[in-house]
Amino acid sequence: MKRNLLISACVGFACSALPASAQISRLVHDADYAIEMSGTASSGDYAPFWLTSNRYGLSSVENNSGYVRGRVQRSTQADSTRLWRVGYGLDLAVPANYTSQAVVQQFYFDVDLRAFRLSVGAKERGESLKNAALSSGGLTQSVNARPVPQVRVELPDFWTIPGTHNWLAVKGHLAYGLFTDNRWQRETHPEGALYSANALYHSKAGFLRIGNEKKFPLSFIGGLEMSAQFGGEAWNVGRRTDDPTFDNSHVNMGHGFKSFWHAFIPGGSDAFDGAYLNNEGNQLGSWHFQLNWKGKDWNLKGYAEHFFEDHSQMFLEYGWKDMLWGVEATLPKNPFVSTVLYEHLRTTDQTGGLYHDATPELGIQISGLDNYYNHSFYGAWQHWGQAMGNPLLLSPVYNENGEIKFKHNRITAHHFGLSGQPLPELSYRLLFSHVRSLGSYEVPNIKPQFANYFMAQADYAPRHFHGLSFSAAVGSNGGSLIGNSFGGMLTLRKTGRF
């Protein structure tokens, strides 16, 4: 009798476990893998700029560097026929001559329900509206720095508002996360210089699309994107001129519910702000505008992004003089050129070089000196030394003395991108940027400094070796900004599916 009960229990357990094991098998068999090796060698003080920038932070400014990388990823699109769709990723790298000896580049879990997604972890997230392969990068968020681990709720793709007959659609996200570069900041900063640790991350965005390409070729996209650093600790903040009783050598910022709320709705104040209160944390963001004209077999896109650090530039109080303007053309299919892009970036105004808080003696508020990407407590809008926004505002990793700040945030730049696919197994892209830097209002250049950055990259995936691909790139730096250099990068990649 006991034996029969035991057999019945085992059979029942096996039957109940079968659906779970089948689910696990499905999740594993739909996953993709990649093994990658890459190496860079160059002359000069730094590796070529476009061999380093806009690579999700998995790069090095050193002359000679490389990595071995392995990743497993499953897209939620593998469950496209299901109500609940599951994706995940684990991406590890062992680098040489990088800012760390081992990199957890991606580690995330995605769950989709209808149009919504919950994403938990560190994930390489592309540009919201720009061509990540050719653009110089967004001003608030780009693909330049390592992913920040976060909990994120989003509409990843445009979702049509019911009842609008596909004429109105929205997309957006809300996220909270944690910066992971504590050790790098602690070891990099020069003695007595500002650095922070355990800073928290917030990001939100909302975009509206007006237009129905099936009915009319012209469409418009507009929206607001905002991010913040908050919480954590800061060292060597420095003495305030209006509060000489405390030197602010170490400051603890808030981590409570109010701090999370003030990151979402800017408000409150930072610890030891003194008599002149600012919003809590480092608040910044961008307004986005884009026009698209979709032809029969071609497409033309014009876009603009306005960056702001505070209310004076968020709205029209001082006028919008600092902008990123861009135009992108996707050409009819041909073996020479597929896409052409041009961008013009200006960040020289920053609402002027004067700041004054209103006082009883002089009741005029002048909200200048925005000092893009820099902050008095958090140092800089960066992660592991790389700009979270546009890399043409030279990242802190280039600072020879290790200071965690942007020293060249007043620039004008012209940027060009070109891509094509001459053969089914061969594609290429070209990037060129010309930058003129005035330094910053804090430390202006005595005379403008210039830089020219160039890169040519070819990717080859031989049809007879399924999943195997090669990438070769050459690049150069020229000018006085980061010096002259010339070098190349080779990458070997094997991909497949379990």
Feature names for model-found ranges:
Residues 1-26, 496-498:
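Bacterial Sec-dependent N-terminal signal peptides
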Residues 23-32, 74-86, 99, 112-117, ...:
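Short loop/turn motifs that connect adjacent beta-strands in outer-membrane beta-barrel proteins
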Residues 40-67, 81-84, 88, 95-99:
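Surface-exposed strand-loop-strand hairpins of Gram-negative outer-membrane beta-barrel proteins
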Residues 81-111, 125-144:
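Surface-exposed loop and membrane-interface regions of Gram-negative outer-membrane beta-barrel proteins
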Residues 125-240:
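Internal, well-ordered domain-core segments that constitute the primary functional module
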Residues 59-67, 98-104, 113, 144-148, ...:
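Transmembrane beta-barrel outer-membrane domains
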